[in-house]
Structure formats: C-alpha cells, structure tokens
Amino acid sequence: NIGMTGCFPDHASADKLAEELSRYGINIVRMHYVSHRTPKEGYPFFDSFIEPVQLERFDYLFAKLKEKGIHIYFQLNIARKVSWVNGFVNAHLLPYYKNGIDNVNERMVYLQKKFHGEILNHINPYTGIAYKDDTSISMMELANENSIVHSWFSPKHKFTALVEPYKSEIIEIWNDWLFDKYGDMETLRTAWGKGTEANADEILPKSKNFKKKNIDW
C-alpha cells in the first residue's frame, strides 16, 4: 500500500520511491486513501475532491511507477470526508468514515460519481493518457469496506444511531423499497416472519412516505 499523504510525495521522493520499489522486484502497488487526506489549502470547490497540488504530485508518482513497470491497484473511494462546507448538516456526527451512508445519500453518491468521472477522465500530463485508458492500472476499486450491512452491525460505525436528516432519509428509502417489493403488510409479515409473528416496528420504521401510501400497520 501507498496511502494517504504517501500518494502525494514531492518529485524527489517519488523518484526515490519508484526506484526502491523496482529494486525490490515489486510490480504492483495499491494507491490507498487517495481521496481521504484533505489538503492544507482545502479544495478549490465545495463539491470537488480534486486539489491541483495533490493531483500534480499524484500524476508524477503514477508516471514514475509506470516507468519502472509497476502496475497500479487504484482505489477510488475510501473514507472520503464530507463536512458542512460540502453542504452536509451534522456531518461531524455521522458514523465513522461515513461508511454505508454514502451508498444511499443522494448528494454523497453524486460527489463520488463526480470525483470518479473527473479523475478517470483526467489526462496525466506526465503520461499523456487519461486514467480510464491507462493499461498500467490493473485493478480499480470503486469503494473500500463500504457495505451498509457491515456498518449496521459494527459498533465502530454506529449506523443504528444516525443523526438527522440522515436517519429519516434512510428510513424513507428502506420503507419505499419494502413497499415496492411486498405491496402490503400481510405479505411483508409473511416474508419476514419466518414462521413467527414478525415485529413490524423492527422491520418497518415509521415514516411519512409509507403513511402516504395508506398502508395500515
């Protein structure tokens, strides 16, 4: 792994790193936590995760590794930080590293897609190739350890103690999915009861949207 600030070394350090890895016979590295480390100067736009100085250093390191025949395992999303600056209310109270919630929050999903599009279409000035077309990228990871199920059961993520407005948002999404799949409470109880009386409060948290669909439970 090359992680966090290690993804953005100065040119001299990048030269040395590529040389050392090659000397030890390493032919693939994982670029880890690329989008996690916030630059000192901040990001140029509220909805951007690309900062010019970091990007230039990343480009240079990538090119030097490529020159040495070292392939890249490119990790795009891990622990991406969000804050009130990006328009997220109570962001500092969200679960550890925002894992799980960024699978369902529309703005978080939008920002991930935006970042993916920007970085993959970016032409590295040192290689002359866009990352999406560079064959030295052997693997690409869209999201790392980001299962909503894992976050639900992990005490570290505290997903069951979401703050507003995120709690209501995910309840609405969950209830809409249940309604679309089962249509009524009797079918829902049968599917989830497994031969016993299903607890509706646990399966179906109360929400405005489900009440609007006139389902009496």
Over which residues does each language-model region extend?
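Active-site mouth of glycoside hydrolases
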Residues: 1-217
